[in-house]
Amino acid sequence: MIASSIPAGGHISHGKKEHSGTAGLVHGLDIEFFAFDPEEMTLDVDKTKAKVEDLKSQNRLPKIAMFGGSVFLFPHPVKELADFLKGHDMHINYDAAHVAGLIAGGKFQDPLREGTDTMTMSTHKTLFGPQGGLVLGFDRHEESIKKAMFPGLTSSHHIHHMAGKAVAFAEALEFGKDYAAQTINNAKALAAELNNVGFKVLGEKRGYTESHQTVVNVLDYGDGGTIEADLEKAN
């Protein structure tokens, strides 16, 4: 599988065995990472294509391409890479756990229409519903997804969540576009003010963010773990 590295915003579940990543450590997958452009704060299309070609020459061509992750300020270049990756027989998934509400509100990107085969998502982050998840895709993948979910991964479902999710989806239909837009505006405003008072906010070149997230380089004050602990104590 090829995915974003954790330093580039990928989720730990997409990581290598040696990084305690779920995909590598638990599922035994051979993991490679997309090339990342730190200036643009997103995936580097040309370098990613070159890497895939190099992996092909080593007979290590990934079977899965995983867009999305835990931290990404800007949409991933799905349209720019989808045809290329499919031309190398990869299944393309988009991990929309953190940005599902922004996608539903039409304010981020539209992965399935941009070329992904499937999209996984949370129902409890930017979509503001009860905790849970969904797998979205096309009819051609329906049976394989069903078999993977049961008996492959689950044995039951949480029926008590369904009413809450229905209400959350109804609210998203009514208020989702405005909510997503304001969420992004809030993140931009926070980033700009943090920058104004002297913090090193990443992504300034592109307006800091087009998602709900703001990323700050805290190395002037200490390492990330220490700063996180200090903020927890101060909260």
Model feature map: region roles:
Residues I2-K200, A229:
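Conserved PLP-enzyme active-site core in the AAT-like
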Residues K188-N235:
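Conserved C-terminal alpha-helix-loop-beta "cap" of PLP-dependent enzymes
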